[in-house]
Amino acid sequence: MSEAMMWLLVRGVWETLAMTFVSGFFGFVIGLPVGVLLYVTRPGQIMENARLYRSLSAVVNIFRSIPFIILLVWMIPFTRIIVGTSIGLQAAIVPLTVGAAPFIARIVENALLEIPAGLIEASRAMGATPLQIVRKILLPEALPGLVNAATITLITLVGYSAMGGAVGAGGLGQIGYQYGYIGYNATVMNTVLVLLVVLVYLIQLSGDRIVRAVTHK
């Protein structure tokens, strides 16, 4: 493998990490409040609102059901409006964020559902407002689950970013497609595969350690 290809792979790793973590951050900025809203508006919860819950849940389910490669192509006009181009690192972050947000929202909702109902009832009995319950009970108690959700999301985004590489998003996916598949270079393809596996392993390892650190003893 040439030195130029090695540097290209290094840049591909950097671009993949940038796409993954930036879109993961914005995905959480959108998905976390949506997930909390899904939980608190569920039937029997502290801000029960069946109509809002059904509407929000339907939107989340619709976006979760769209395969990422279809979402990527469908969002090209919107991506051009937002960042001025439909190819490259910045352009990839837009559909990655949109793809991650509903996924995060549903995982956040499920993490909150694991909290014992008795804690919430005790807080309500002491006069806590819904906002106080969310800030002081729900989010702290669900922190291990939320960290696990972040780990799963980042791993999913690594795979999404690789798919995006096939349509010019950059990163390891584009290198594997352009030089490995189109260029019939098995060495490049295998190297990209190994690098993606290593990235996923490191993200999972880091996530597991953080979960252990924040889990209540």
From Swiss-Prot:
Keywords: Amino-acid transport, Cell inner membrane, Cell membrane, Membrane, Transmembrane, Transmembrane helix, Transport. One of its GO terms (cellular component) is plasma membrane. SUPFAM superfamilies: MetI-like. GO terms for biological process: D-methionine transmembrane transport. It is a multi-pass membrane protein. InterPro entries: AA_ABC_Transporter_Permease, MetI-like, MetI-like_sf. It comes from the Bacteria. The chain crosses the membrane at residues 20-40, 68-88, 93-113, 152-172, 186-206. Signal peptide: none annotated. Residues 41-67, 114-151, 207-217 are cytoplasmic. Residues 1-19, 89-92, 173-185 are periplasmic. Residues 13-204 form the ABC transmembrane type-1 domain. PROSITE patterns: ABC_TM1 (PS50928). It is found in: Cell inner membrane. Part of the binding-protein-dependent transport system for D-methionine and the toxic methionine analog alpha-methyl-methionine. Probably responsible for the translocation of the substrate across the membrane. Belongs to the binding-protein-dependent transport system permease family. CysTW subfamily. This is D-methionine transport system permease protein MetI.
